[in-house]
């Protein structure tokens, strides 16, 4: 899913799509993806689980490519390397903290409940965080929608 997300984002962004909107699509794919993974356990459905995992990768690829492209587009021409490094550092730090906190929470809940319940708790928090991300991104999308498109872009033709 992740590779497909990166490939799709590359294709769409290469045609002039807005990077912030691409990031939002990643968030919007992630919400039902985590719901599918949570729902797969009580339904005992490996297919729903696999679909959810694939969608998590797809959403992650869309989001990552969108945020990287937005970061690079906002950087001054002589500071794109710095922007890339900062983006990478934020991604790595965020992923590390998320995995650590998710693991601690999963283990803590698993002591009192089933492993499926523990993962459901972690993924439910992820859903809430994705929804918060969508809300936080709204001003970026509104501000960009109000700006005129540069002449010659695919969307201005």
Segments from the language model and where they lie:
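A membrane-interface helix-boundary motif in multi-pass transporters
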Residues: 18-21, 104-128
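Multi-pass alpha-helical transporter architecture, strongest
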Residues: 40, 119-157
